[in-house]
């Protein structure tokens, strides 16, 4: 029975998550596959991506007697060059060693990029997105040995190393000038 409930707008719950986002990614890939010998092959490639993003969020200020709402706009564009190099060495028809050097990226979640700002004066807290976040990038080295068995399947062992940059995380700081968290 809907009449048993009283409707109440709760803008602090829905306004920060209401946003418009536009993201365009333009990419291209070049690849070269080469047999270096009867046992060794190489695959080299590079992917280039250009990203354009724009967001419109809400800047919200909860004052004692009113709520101030203004649009917040954020844009960014960047280019990533992601080379890769793969080698495969066949010891036999059933055993091989693979080695790879790759570069990858992980873009931030849309909501993390939205330029929203939620200022709650009573709690002395500010929550906000960051449209200037860079994607997380990593340079990866992988080594894998594979042995195939006709009756059992495959036995493989591998090792890898990743160097991760621009890792995205949530932080909380206190501004001594304002007292806000």
Task: Give the location of each predicted region.
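Repeated loop/turn-to-beta-strand initiation elements of outer-membrane beta-barrel proteins
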Residues: 39-42, 94-97, 151-155
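Outer-membrane beta-barrel signature, preferentially recognizing the C-terminal barrel domain
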Residues: 13, 17-26, 76, 105-164
């Amino acid at each position: 029975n809907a009449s048993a409930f009283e409707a109440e707008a709760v803008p602090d719950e829905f306004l920060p998550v209401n946003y418009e986002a536009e993201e365009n990614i333009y990419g291209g890939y070049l690849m070269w596959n080469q047999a270096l010998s009867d046992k060794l092959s190489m695959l080299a490639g590079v992917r280039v991506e250009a990203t354009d993003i724009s967001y419109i969020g809400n800047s919200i200020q909860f004052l004692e007697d009113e709520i101030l709402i203004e649009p917040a706009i954020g844009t960014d564009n960047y280019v990533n060059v992601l080379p890769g190099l793969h080698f495969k060495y066949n010891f036999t028809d059933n055993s091989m060693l693979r080695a790879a050097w790759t570069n990858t990226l992980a873009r931030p979640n849309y909501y993390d990029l939205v330029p929203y700002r939620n200022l709650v004066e009573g709690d002395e807290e500010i929550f906000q997105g960051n449209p200037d976040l860079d994607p997380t990038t990593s340079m990866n080295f992988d080594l894998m040995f594979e042995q195939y068995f006709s009756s059992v399947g495959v036995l493989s062992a591998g090792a890898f190393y990743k160097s991760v940059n621009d890792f995205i995380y949530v932080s909380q700081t206190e501004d001594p000038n304002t007292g806000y968290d």
